[in-house]
Amino acid sequence: MESRARCIFLLLLQILTRARGDILPSVCGHSRDAGKIVGGQDALEGQWPWQVSLWITEDGHICGGSLIHEVWVLTAAHCFRRSLNPSFYHVKVGGLTLSLLEPHSTLVAVRNIFVHPTYLWADASSGDIALVQLDTPLRPSQFTPVCLPAAQTPLTPGTVCWVTGWGATQERDMASVLQELAVPLLDSEDCEKMYHTQGSSLSGERIIQSDMLCAGYVEGQKDSCQGDSGGPLVCSINSSWTQVGITSWGIGCARPYRPGVYTRVPTYVDWIQRILAENHSDAYGYHSSASAAYQMLLPVLLAVALPGSL
């Protein structure tokens, strides 16, 4: 009997511990039905509600990003080449334009910046991923998070996904309204071959690394561009928008044989979860419901499973 009670206790404890570590929202990736984005179109209000703009406080928009939680933004590491000082940055949440006068938008201060340790601060580097911790939590009415994929999510070439951002609509002109663009995922080896054609100066070097993902068109004409960096590449998976890529780099914009290159998000899901778990809740004076349940039920479980232990 005692052995059975111990087994029950350990099982319940394991369940609660797992729940305690599940920080990402259970509801995500929902928007209105559905592209710098070259060859794209204006997005509609509420269509990509996780899209945010990363601002340098004095200069305005520099990169895109995506809300994955009420205090967490996913973006690219190269967006922080100027400084890793959180006080340099704000995040604009809500709205379709970069105007601070737009209704339902707000500018939020940044508390912390976490850049992946493998990023080399060089063009086309692996590890081009970063997490931004907001200084204050967003209210439920202010945000809808994008879903994150499982680490083993298959990314099938030919799958049509969407990239969004305020970057250039040509190689020079910035967009005033959030742009959206449908792009097919590409096979990594095919993408590698494309970057070694048409007079590439990178011949002999491996360009597309295992943590990178290509999307776009062989003929060019449609692509993400400067100012879109850090923004999301999302696919519809199980009827929810799931972020599979982060706009990372490319050569020019919408050029033939030069598709956009994105950080492959499934590669970094474990890192994202670890950073969130290590820097969650206590600093804001609140606790997750799972954590509260854990604290309330643990004494009860001990009393039931281990009589006389309390």
Curated annotation (Swiss-Prot):
EC number: 3.4.21.-
Disulfide links within the chain: C63-C79, C161-C235, C191-C214, C225-C253
Domain of life of the source: Eukaryota
Major location category of this protein: membrane
Cell compartments where the protein resides: Cell membrane
Active site: H78, D128, S229
Membrane topology reported for the UniProt record: Lipid-anchor; GPI-anchor
Activity regulation info: Inhibited by aprotinin, leupeptin, benzamidine and soybean trypsin inhibitor. Partially inhibited by PMSF and DFP.
Entry keyword set: Cell membrane, Disulfide bond, Glycoprotein, GPI-anchor, Hydrolase, Ion transport, Lipoprotein, Membrane, Protease, Serine protease, Signal, Sodium, Sodium transport, Transport, Zymogen
Pro-peptide region(s): 22-36, 282-310
Described purpose of this protein according to its UniProt entry: Selectively cleaves synthetic peptide substrates of trypsin. Activates the epithelial sodium channel ENaC.
Protein name stated in the entry: Serine protease 30
Lineage start: Eukaryota, Metazoa, Chordata, Craniata, Vertebrata
